[in-house]
């Protein structure tokens, strides 16, 4: 069975992954059929680039993405777009829906970042209050 998965590259403690279509029996960093994208987890924010037409091709011929590959593909919006096409939605409606999806996704990302910043500030304030008392 063909799987869409990550192939590790980069150097020690600086991972960089290729998103590949590979035979499920092949080792993680072994033989693969095609490179269909890249993922850089060390970049801030994480950098994901995929060739949407090739990923769509492999998914349509039955390739199964691993959990991590699935979440990366989903984060790009490709699965949502493919689902709309499968339902028979017109290209114009797909374009408007994908723009709306991009807006919602940007808002979610911003909301997560602000929540993370608030938690960090609260933690610093608690540490400062704790050190002032002690």
UniProtKB/Swiss-Prot annotation:
Cell membrane among keywords: no
Organism field: Chlorobaculum parvum (strain DSM 263 / NCIMB 8327)
Keyword set, alphabetical order: Ribonucleoprotein, Ribosomal protein
Stored Gene3D superfamilies: 3.30.1320.10
Positions of region (Disordered): 105-134
Any GO molecular function: structural constituent of ribosome
Protein name: Small ribosomal subunit protein bS16
HAMAP family noted in UniProt: Ribosomal_bS16
Protein family membership: Belongs to the bacterial ribosomal protein bS16 family.
Compositional bias of kind Basic residues: 109-123
GO biological process, one term: translation
Gene it is expressed from: rpsP
Matches recorded under PANTHER family: 30S RIBOSOMAL PROTEIN S16 (PTHR12919), SMALL RIBOSOMAL SUBUNIT PROTEIN BS16M (PTHR12919:SF20)
Cellular component per GO, a single term: small ribosomal subunit
